[in-house]
């Protein structure tokens, strides 16, 4: 018998996570399995001080002008180009985060400088400035001052993470072996170990500061770790699981 070889389908390059999610949204209308911005959730929720809708055409520029700088992040979902009346090129980029979507305008040299970042599917970190060009004018200008990829800045933006933990939460409860005394109470004996394991598995460039809060004295013991970490969703979620814990993120270096 002559064996006839069956045609094999051509090998195709595997889609990236973003491409898969975009196809998912095209078919269903929403992201189902994940969101393309999930890797940058810590930045969007703790570093950014604005959403795309906050800087749109109906933005309250008086309020925005009170901020030293406006920081927002999101994924590019649309790009269109054109020309100003003076003949200079311009671009309009639609940025979307978890909460809103807005088209941002880039004019003249600003568009020429950052147009390479305006690719549908790209995740961007955008810095803007709102100011009066002339003291005698009521018009407040809103301009883009910097555009970077979120993937390039997510490990650089957060300079330090401070975790404040009640001292009682790090102590094993008395009589932990007595079921009657500890019924309904959480066993805290492994909290420090679990936290240490989580932090150790997330090496990076961010300074880590631990504050132990003593409820009796009202004082905090502050320790600066020799190790540096990457602040990710798992760490933030672990902190949020403990209702008495607090955390703060700094974008400037601090001294312990």
What are these regions (language model features)?
Residues 1-256:
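Noncatalytic, beta-rich nucleic-acid-contacting surfaces in large DNA/RNA-processing enzymes
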């Amino acid at each position: 018998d002559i064996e006839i070889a069956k045609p094999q389908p051509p090998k195709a390059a595997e889609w990236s996570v973003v491409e898969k999610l975009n196809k998912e949204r095209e078919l269903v209308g929403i992201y189902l399995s994940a969101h393309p911005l999930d890797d940058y959730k810590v930045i969007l929720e703790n570093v950014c001080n604005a959403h795309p809708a906050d800087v749109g055409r109906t933005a309250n520029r008086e309020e925005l002008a009170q901020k030293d700088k406006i920081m927002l992040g999101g994924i590019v979902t649309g790009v269109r180009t054109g020309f100003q009346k003076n003949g200079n090129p311009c671009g309009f980029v639609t940025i979307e985060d978890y909460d809103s979507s807005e088209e941002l305008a880039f004019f003249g040299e600003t568009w020429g400088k950052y147009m390479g970042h305006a690719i549908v599917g790209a995740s961007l970190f955008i810095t803007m400035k709102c100011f009066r060009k002339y003291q005698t004018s009521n018009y407040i200008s809103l301009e883009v001052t910097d555009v970077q990829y979120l993937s390039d800045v997510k490990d650089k933006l957060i300079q330090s993470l401070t975790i404040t933990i009640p001292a009682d939460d790090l102590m094993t409860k008395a009589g932990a072996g007595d079921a009657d005394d500890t019924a309904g109470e959480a066993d805290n004996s492994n909290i420090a170990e679990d936290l240490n394991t989580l932090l150790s598995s997330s090496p990076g460039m961010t300074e880590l500061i631990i504050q132990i809060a003593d409820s009796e004295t009202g004082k905090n013991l502050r320790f600066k770790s020799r190790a540096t970490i990457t602040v990710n969703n798992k760490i933030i979620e672990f902190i949020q699981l403990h209702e008495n814990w607090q955390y703060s993120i700094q974008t400037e270096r601090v001294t312990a």
